[in-house]
């Protein structure tokens, strides 16, 4: 059964400096980072500030309170380490917990 939980209570952009670990060739890997204030149920999108050939972000989520999980994809035949010390932008949308009938 699906239901609508209403509008957003809060939406904000967080800047967080990250140093992801190596991603082995031709794979995806989820890595977690501490980001204070995140809550389970928050919707997040992530933006890496620079492009790296063969490297992409294919998903991000809040895996636990204060924990951002980013899934990186390495589409090359060599290992890639995302650039260390970069400031990622994370858009956080926190839904209202009030259940509605779906009419906006």
Where does each model-flagged region fall?
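Structured beta-strand segments within beta-sheet-rich domains
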Residues: 56-86
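Short solvent-exposed loop/turn micro-motifs enriched in small/polar/acidic residues
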Residues: 26, 53-55
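Extracellular receptor-binding modules and their adjoining Ser/Thr/Gly/Asp/Asn-rich linkers
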Residues: 1-38, 68, 79-104
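Short, surface-exposed alpha-helix to beta-strand junction/turn motifs within ectodomains of secreted
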Residues: 38-49
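Residues in well-ordered beta-strands of folded domains
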Residues: 45-47, 71, 91-93
């Amino acid at each position: 059964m699906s239901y609508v939980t209403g509008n957003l209570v809060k939406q904000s952009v967080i800047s967080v400096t990250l140093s992801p670990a190596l991603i082995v060739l031709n794979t995806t890997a989820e890595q977690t980072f501490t980001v204070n204030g995140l809550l389970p149920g928050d919707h997040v999108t992530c933006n890496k500030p620079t492009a790296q050939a063969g490297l992409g972000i294919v998903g991000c989520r809040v895996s636990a309170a204060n924990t951002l999980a980013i899934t990186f994809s390495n589409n090359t035949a060599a290992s890639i380490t995302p650039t260390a010390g970069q400031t990622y932008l994370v858009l956080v949308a926190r839904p209202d917990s009030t259940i509605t009938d779906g009419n906006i």
